[in-house]
Amino acid sequence: MSYQDLKECKIITAFITPFHEDGSINFDAIPALIEHLLAHHTDGILLAGTTAESPTLTHDEELELFAAVQKVVNGRVPLIAGVGTNDTRDSIEFVKEVAEFGGFAAGLAIVPYYNKPSQEGMYQHFKAIADASDLPIIIYNIPGRVVVELTPETMLRLADYPNIIGVKECTSLANMAYLIEHKPEEFLIYTGEDGDAFHAMNLGADGVISVASHTNGDEMHEMFTAIAESDMKKAAAIQRKFIPKVNALFSYPSPAPVKAVLNYMGFEAGPTRLPLIPAPEEDAKRIIKVVVDGDYEATKATVTGVLRPDY
């Protein structure tokens, strides 16, 4: 698979990792959840990303997860593998392993967290990962999690690199507009913020890498279709009703809220792994009321404005 395969993907779901109560991966829960996503307009799937609780997964567990999902998906939509860490050497070794494993359209590599590299350090980091294999690389720029921000200027330097094909951008709409205006033609720009998807698509982004698509894929698809048909009034009306649901899904450290909703819907998402904990019972009930029932009053006591998924 290639850039062209991903170019057709508007809604890429950042897949949760289902766990048993003892913390082991619940592989039996994967088929039903995958079929649910594909039935509700997921165009591609990201595995072993932040929403998958990747900091708590070993590389061996990630490879097991990859195999299980590939078996169910069976080529129906493109898959992206989370491959990056804050250790360049480890990222290089894992991207080689994933490339050899096969079956992925791209690897997602996050901006290095905690060690706070310079712009040149980040440039060299991603260049080294891209050079390590023929697996196309998408950069994940999320300063709310990693502390440092890859600037648009550095991003555009990397966009010219042959094996770097896109970015999951979680900085600002201003940065996104600048990147869209100045990027090479074959460079994908996704927002990683569900609440910004309406604005990003109107700016010319390629799509969203989403948490909300686990539970609200139909609404997102309807909104994107309205945008494509230049029906801004309809798209904006959907967005206004969608925002409270996004707020609810990020009102507690993610992916705890979306797992609470999926468990309620009958999918065995299970708990989170420490250090993340499930949403408290009363909070989970409010989240479910908003996301499933559209009961926007349920979240007003604790959520105002637009929450950004910095956590």
Swiss-Prot record:
<dbReference type="InterPro" id="IPR013785">
    <property type="entry name" value="Aldolase_TIM"/>
</dbReference>
<protein>
    <recommendedName>
        <fullName>4-hydroxy-tetrahydrodipicolinate synthase</fullName>
        <ecNumber>4.3.3.7</ecNumber>
    </recommendedName>
</protein>
<dbReference type="GO" id="GO:0008840">
    <property type="term" value="F:4-hydroxy-tetrahydrodipicolinate synthase activity"/>
</dbReference>
<feature type="active site" description="Schiff-base intermediate with substrate">
    <location>
        <position position="168"/>
    </location>
</feature>
<feature type="site" description="Part of a proton relay during catalysis">
    <location>
        <position position="50"/>
    </location>
</feature>
<dbReference type="InterPro" id="IPR020625">
    <property type="entry name" value="Schiff_base-form_aldolases_AS"/>
</dbReference>
<comment type="function">
    <text>Catalyzes the condensation of (S)-aspartate-beta-semialdehyde [(S)-ASA] and pyruvate to 4-hydroxy-tetrahydrodipicolinate (HTPA).</text>
</comment>
<comment type="pathway">
    <text>Amino-acid biosynthesis; L-lysine biosynthesis via DAP pathway; (S)-tetrahydrodipicolinate from L-aspartate: step 3/4.</text>
</comment>
<dbReference type="GO" id="GO:0009089">
    <property type="term" value="P:lysine biosynthetic process via diaminopimelate"/>
</dbReference>
<keyword id="KW-0457">Lysine biosynthesis</keyword>
<comment type="subunit">
    <text>Homotetramer; dimer of dimers.</text>
</comment>
<keyword id="KW-0028">Amino-acid biosynthesis</keyword>
<dbReference type="InterPro" id="IPR002220">
    <property type="entry name" value="DapA-like"/>
</dbReference>
<dbReference type="GO" id="GO:0005829">
    <property type="term" value="C:cytosol"/>
</dbReference>
<keyword id="KW-0456">Lyase</keyword>
<keyword id="KW-0220">Diaminopimelate biosynthesis</keyword>
<keyword id="KW-0963">Cytoplasm</keyword>
<comment type="similarity">
    <text>Belongs to the DapA family.</text>
</comment>
<feature type="binding site">
    <location>
        <position position="209"/>
    </location>
    <ligand>
        <name>pyruvate</name>
    </ligand>
</feature>
<keyword id="KW-0704">Schiff base</keyword>
<feature type="active site" description="Proton donor/acceptor">
    <location>
        <position position="140"/>
    </location>
</feature>
<dbReference type="InterPro" id="IPR005263">
    <property type="entry name" value="DapA"/>
</dbReference>
<dbReference type="Pfam" id="PF00701">
    <property type="entry name" value="DHDPS"/>
</dbReference>
<feature type="binding site">
    <location>
        <position position="51"/>
    </location>
    <ligand>
        <name>pyruvate</name>
    </ligand>
</feature>
<feature type="site" description="Part of a proton relay during catalysis">
    <location>
        <position position="114"/>
    </location>
</feature>
<dbReference type="GO" id="GO:0019877">
    <property type="term" value="P:diaminopimelate biosynthetic process"/>
</dbReference>
